[in-house]
Amino acid sequence: MKSDLFSGRCGMTLTLLLLLFPYTAKAQTANSNHPVTDAEKMTDALRAGPKFITKDATILDWPVKAGGEYRVLRKGTNEWTCLPGVPGYSHDEPGCFDPVFMQWIKDSLAGREPHITTIGIAYMYVGAWVPAKSGKDITSKSDEFHVGPHIMIVSPRENQKELQSFSRDGSNGMPYVAHLPNGTDLYLVLPFRQWDEK
């Protein structure tokens, strides 16, 4: 069963905000490969970024409802935070976030408008499943493709126009931008390895 955090239309919007990928509710099916125990969640979260970050990062578990508390699985000593894949998401997609990106997530989850004054960076070493064209709803498996390990960047709204020159098509492995459904703020995705490369 999905947690209250990710149920319903509101929860779906929050999920989109959290992971920056424009999935539809039709893609939100439980995945039996998702971590369940705390040990599994920690292992999953540690897959999300480079070891020089993950080895000292704080590991959190997602709150069970909107506005809820994140549960600390391991207290870290650097400024990075890693989380396992989102419960109930169609694919397991853990991430590691710098303080700006993490604050952006927390603001979004709490229903606050994110206020960031500098760029925020996130790693997704496991990659993610995204639409063939950024912003297109996924209605079937044939609509989606896997973006390999990548970095994501969010920026303050005053910098948005600088992102508009990037392509919105992420299917060719090149850097691209996308925006949330019903939103205009762009975020930048920088793949650095194809998903099938070892």
Where are these regions (language model features)?
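Bacterial N-terminal signal peptides
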Residues: G11-P22
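Primary mode marks residue(s) on the alpha4-beta5-alpha5 output face of response regulator receiver
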Residues: T29-K198
